[in-house]
From Swiss-Prot:
It comes from Buchnera aphidicola subsp. Acyrthosiphon pisum (strain APS) (Acyrthosiphon pisum symbiotic bacterium). Mg(2+) binds at D14, G41. Binds 1 Mg(2+) ion per subunit. Plays an important role in the de novo pathway of purine nucleotide biosynthesis. Catalyzes the first committed step in the biosynthesis of AMP from IMP. GO terms for biological process: 'de novo' AMP biosynthetic process; IMP metabolic process. One of its GO terms (cellular component) is cytoplasm. Belongs to the adenylosuccinate synthetase family. The gene is purA. It comes from the Bacteria. Its EC number is 6.3.4.4. Pathway: Purine metabolism; AMP biosynthesis via de novo pathway; AMP from IMP: step 1/2. The lineage of its organism: Bacteria, Pseudomonadati, Pseudomonadota, Gammaproteobacteria, Enterobacterales. This is Adenylosuccinate synthetase. Gene3D superfamilies: Adenylosuccinate Synthetase, subunit A, domain 1, Adenylosuccinate Synthetase, subunit A, domain 2, Adenylosuccinate Synthetase, subunit A, domain 3.
Amino acid sequence: MNKNIVILGTQWGDEGKGKVVDCLTKDSSYVVRYQGGHNAGHTLVVNDKKIILHLIPSGLLHKNVIGIIANGVVVSPFELIKEIKMLETHNIFVHKRLFISNSSPLILQYHIEMDIAREKKLGISALGTTGRGIGPAYEDKIARRALRIGDLKNEKTLSIRLEKIVNYYNHQLVSFYKHKPVDYKIILRDLLPTIDLIYDMIKDTTSILHTAIQSNKKIIFEGAQGSFLDIDHGTYPYVTSSNSTIGGVITGTGVGSKSLDYILGVTKAYSTRVGYGPFPTELFDDVDKHFSKKGHEFGSTTGRKRRTGWLDAVALCRSVRINSLSGLCITKLDVLDGLHEIKICTAYKNINTLEIISFPDIDEWKNIEPIYETYPGWNKKTLGIKKLIDLPYEARNYINRIEEITQIPVDIISTGPDRSDIIFVRDIFFIKK
Ligand code: IMP
């Protein structure tokens, strides 16, 4: 039996992981966020109500589940409290069942100002970040100057270190970026009242997870962003600042690879990307309009229009290998309903040399062109279908082709935004390894 399941994105984020996590956590004891911060946006529809979570693990909507924000996550205490209060308005209370690692780096105002100032200075070369301070917060961690959640427990040293860091940031913000400075006293004034609210949640989450594993509890590891936004394996520099591929689970929680039983790669039935950077299958035609409108392809964190394109199986196969995926979950299949034909990119060609490129390096991206296989679309509705057998023949064909190309099974198919719009092809908790 598979107890510990990782759910991660195989594309550029926004694959629909939140809903899948929500569905699978129903049968689990723990749900764990291991990387990223409130740059993520996980949208869930429960009883026709839309709930968007950025930082709190999506699975916490189930009342018996314990949520962990592990050490790999960068945490804004303000965002955390905002989300806790938002959940309370939906009668979801997280008291005594949400724990935050004492080692998680904090995101504070100076990170956000630095993120914004940098993007502004980069002008047309900007990365298109979410402006949430994610990059600067991870830089502080690597530079070993970060304030971490555990530091909130000692007000005196917190204020001394905060003042030093603010001086360091203000020097760059003002002298180099010609940006407004931040005020250390205001940051401290706003931060102090948050401490009481989260004090009891601060724990050694690694130990909690080790105990849970020893007690045979089921754990869902909830990824944020997608594999090609990974700082090491993504389309650098157009990436986020964390490891959104499988390695992030291990470093971001303190749980070793032997304890991970099944790795589910969540893949949208087509592709989207927010922000700038390579996107070989990008479309600018009526199909783009179809995906945007029918798929509501607007960022849940920033509201930006997502770029859209056909499914990129070259990237997907790379993702299968990077993450050692056990199986796939195809989401938003219903968005393809009504398209006359459907394409899958199965290779990249260099437009100058006409060579087939296995995976482009940084300078090669601009010279590649996707090679497509084309399949007939379907005119029937797949929205809300719950059994594989009920899908139109052409839709099953499309799924089969994805399995053939990637050489791994499609175990779950999401056919709409609601929790219940889902096909479980196999029960992944019971698949033999
Ligand atoms: P950052 O994570 O805010 O630094 O943004 C870096 C890049 O990652 C930008 O292109 C963002 O649009 C993208 N990004 C960050 N988080 C998400 C996400 O949750 N979904 C999709 N794209 C994201």
